[in-house]
Amino acid sequence: MVLNLDTENRKMQDGNNDDDFDLEVQIPNSIFEKLKSIEALKARESPMCVSGKDDSIPTCDQNSTPGMITQRSCVYGGARVVLMPITDAVHLVHGPIGCAACTWDIRGSKSTGDKLYKNGFSTDLQEKDIVFGGEKKLYESILEVNKLYHPGAIFVYSTCVVGLIGDDLKAVCRQAQEATGCRVIPVQSEGFKSFNKTAGHKLACDAMLDYVIGTEEPEEEHPYSINIIGEFNVAGDLWGIIPLYEKMGVKVHTAITGDSTVAKVASAHRSKLNIVQCPKSSNYLAAQMDKKYGIPSFKVNFFGLDETTKSLRAVAEFFGDEEMIKRTEELIKSEIKNLRDEISEYQKDLSGRTVAIYSGAHKSWALVSAFGELDMEIIMSGTQNGKPEDYQQIRDHVCEGTLIVDDASSMELVQLLKEYKPDILISGAKEKYLSLKSGIPHCDFNHDRITAFSGYQGFINFARVVHTAVMTPIWRLSRKMMI
């Protein structure tokens, strides 16, 4: 099957009439010709579109198309990535060993203190447990890990199998908490609850709201204290943000959940402001904390110089302290001045280069400004689990003619890369090797990366990694061999 993106089809899908449909006037026909050459299942036509003057977005937030191999994660995986960075907690997976194995250290989060979260724990359900139930095994497992590790809390994750056999997770956790005196927190994250792992993010946030946040008081209250929500300290990202706010005179009480502890999250309700780095995973949490504790929130973005600057200024303006505002402007001026020369060197080689992004919904549009500062052009942007509002953000940030795609399979991505020939693909580890095998340089921006990309210094690190990937001589040789 070949993608059919002719004018009539687009009119039918978007609901546009002849008077307001003028997409082809704005976008070169060559863009549509590229898409028409991509082989795909017929049901996969509408999850791809080209940004233009109309308001069309890909069909999204639906079950994956039968017959294609999706790269999506499950609800359990969505819950796991939100809670795992709590450093002094045990994360116990109630299910088969494979569920724990495939999510072990899934976030790549770093810690300044406890490393307990780096361990993987599972009840390792077997066939007999499926027949007779796994509640006793779960109870004994909780008692054992508490005796061995004395954690700040034990998060117990439900998986698909547990949902099918009907183990009462909440009852077992309640009994185990009474027996141990340790917080034992059920996370009802059966993987089959939704096709979108974002449901798992919400379940993880509910677990924190119901059992952790608001249960302790901070050691001291600061007049300018904030929580950074949706920041998971991947590769140490958080450590490029906190020092900036400290220089402004702002106290970062905790990130939720990067490099956090149970006690810090428990006392987060006393902070004066929540700033949200990843709205996909944490908008819900910020909204609920506002509703329950009266903590206002707004979105920030620490990827790129301009976005980092806006995020610092927004916090200073929120508190309205004149001295803080003055310090913030001096800090911004100093930080950018120190980086201009190095950025210019990278721009010389990267200017005009093209980029494809296939990553989380937030990063798929949040990186647009950062690449603009390197004078690079985004020609494709997509995600596995985007919702309509995510694709509207992408559409609003990218240039006309940019391909926007939802839930692409490996086959489709390979064809898109070969057809569009970007100078680099920004994605996660799942797409890394298909990109490299296609002769396309790759930059890992997801959980497996080892370099911090947030804040001013993080942007320099990012520019360096992108520059190294694009300018490596092997690509000139490999492309000649592939022709």
Curated annotation (Swiss-Prot):
This is Nitrogenase iron-molybdenum cofactor biosynthesis protein NifE. The lineage of its organism: Archaea, Methanobacteriati, Methanobacteriota, Methanomada group, Methanococci. Pathway: Cofactor biosynthesis; Fe-Mo cofactor biosynthesis. It holds the Pfam family Oxidored_nitro. SUPFAM superfamilies: Helical backbone' metal receptor. It comes from the Archaea. Residues 1-20 are annotated as: Disordered. The keyword Ion transport does not apply. Gene3D superfamilies: Nitrogenase MoFe cofactor biosynthesis protein NifE, C-terminal (3.40.50.12380), Nitrogenase molybdenum iron protein domain (3.40.50.1980). GO terms for molecular function: nitrogenase activity. Belongs to the NifD/NifK/NifE/NifN family. This protein may play a role in the biosynthesis of the prosthetic group of nitrogenase (FeMo cofactor). PANTHER family: NITROGENASE IRON-MOLYBDENUM COFACTOR BIOSYNTHESIS PROTEIN NIFE. One of its GO terms (biological process) is protein-containing complex assembly. The keyword Nucleotide-binding does not apply. The gene is nifE. Keywords: Nitrogen fixation.
